[in-house]
């Protein structure tokens, strides 16, 4: 077998490979040299560290932002919730507006410059948020952090380019795991480090944001030193230069793109809905259909969910994907969703009727089973790669998907928590209405999977990187 020498990469190299040459249809041979595979997975590990910074920056302020608004801006207690909702959402709204421009910039400048610039800007702006002394400054720094939203789209495509069909499922499992880790660590930093006194007594909310920023700066330096540019000069050929630009409209008209974007968005909406409501549900008293947990048990269940997700994503998903494929996993997880929601309601009923032994058997089992639906999001990452009409369209397609997710992250939590709160005013069994609505949305998702494109059902199609 002929071994082609690796091409030298720099920051001005084309972002995505041409369709000419080996693997010109986007298909990468499964065989990869062990040394090259080890190097690629090292790159994936670094990129996953970068992936964790976005949710870390997003969620760090959640434990203290309400008190910060009341203390810093002098807002009436009755109005704090309104302003905190705006400040929390501004990150995602700004990110949504600039996601596609960041992808375009990466097409022109290369992956690595956009990654480093985004990470550095996100880290610094997140750190400065804790030093805000007015409501206007809080809004400004939150929007500034969202402006540097190019990290996620760049990391997602670079992971695709650093993996082969054999390693892609595991790589995107790590990608999803990194998001989970950032989501868990962010609130822990915010809750544990705010109002420490001492040197921070004049800025009581600065320490957690500085800590989050320090994480970001550390990862930025590591990526600057060790992450390789994935856009190689050899990939940029006259064929690619002469090919038409892949505009957003042209990508949307490509076969299979619209169904996959919708299914991805629908899956994320379900995830955001449950993630937002679950802490409130755990806190709600059993007489209103909740679990009535103390903060300790709430954190125990949330932490247990994170551990269970880690096991499902890292140990279960890669071999399961190899055996069943993306489409079958998505359909199977819709069934798991229904069982999980029914078991959650069943556990609540047991608690309400003081059947505590049965409750403590069913509730943890439901939690572990329900955590498996995190694999749905990893499967959708692979589906996006599969429907990309061209290597040159992959960055923009991912940016479009992430823009949709940013919008949902901005509006879904408030929408579904308000819905859940309104159902608590109903008489029994009306306070279980929210779970019926969520189950209905799962059935809609299962129905839309009928339009899952054929190429998603098959083995992963590789768009970014080739091996001889």
From Swiss-Prot:
Parts of the chain that traverse the membrane: 43-65, 80-100, 112-132, 135-155, 174-194, 207-227, 257-277, 296-316, 329-349, 357-377, 387-407, 429-449
Keywords, comma-separated and alphabetical: Cell membrane, Glycoprotein, Membrane, Transmembrane, Transmembrane helix, Transport
Membrane topology term: Multi-pass membrane protein
Main location class: membrane
UniProt subcellular location: Cell membrane
Chain segments carrying region Disordered: 1-30
CDD domains, A to Z: MFS_SLC46_TetA_like
Entry function: Efflux pump that might be required for efficient secretion of azaphilones.
Family per similarity comment: Belongs to the major facilitator superfamily.
Listed name of the protein: Efflux pump azaK
Species this chain originates from: Aspergillus niger (strain ATCC 1015 / CBS 113.46 / FGSC A1144 / LSHB Ac4 / NCTC 3858a / NRRL 328 / USDA 3528.7)
Gene expressing this chain: azaK
